[in-house]
Amino acid sequence: MYKDVDSHQRDSRSDGHQDGFKKNPNFRFFKKKTCKFCDMDRVPDYKEFDFLKKFITEQGKILPRRITGTSAKHQRRLALEIKKARYMALLPFVKQ
């Protein structure tokens, strides 16, 4: 049923790599981001507007969690607290 093929013929590929994968020189290893709120055991609060400034862009937009590394639970809470701080005029809606 199966042909008897020696291991050298099975492992050799046409591209010259034994494992069959081409090496990508542009590949970069990214460190997984961790949630700052989970690490420090703190909850986002609108009164800490200096800390909340780290999570908004220069234009005043809320940064997504794939960039900040926050968990889904804390990202939802963070968005609410930023909106509260904007309403209380602690953070600007739009930066000029």
Swiss-Prot record:
InterPro entries: Ribosomal_bS18, Ribosomal_bS18_CS, Ribosomal_bS18_sf
Molecular function terms from GO: small ribosomal subunit rRNA binding; structural constituent of ribosome
Pfam families hit by this protein: Ribosomal_S18 (PF01084)
Keyword Lipoprotein: no
Keywords: Ribonucleoprotein, Ribosomal protein, RNA-binding, rRNA-binding
SUPFAM superfamilies named in the record: Ribosomal protein S18 (SSF46911)
Region Disordered: start-end pairs: 1-25
GO cellular component, one term: cytosolic small ribosomal subunit
Chain intervals with Basic and acidic residues compositional bias: 1-22
Domain of life: Bacteria
GO biological process: translation
Quaternary structure, from the entry: Part of the 30S ribosomal subunit. Forms a tight heterodimer with protein bS6.
NCBIfam families with a match to the protein in the record: S18
Record-stated family: Belongs to the bacterial ribosomal protein bS18 family.
Function: Binds as a heterodimer with protein bS6 to the central domain of the 16S rRNA, where it helps stabilize the platform of the 30S subunit.
Name of the protein in question: Small ribosomal subunit protein bS18
Gene name tied to this protein: rpsR
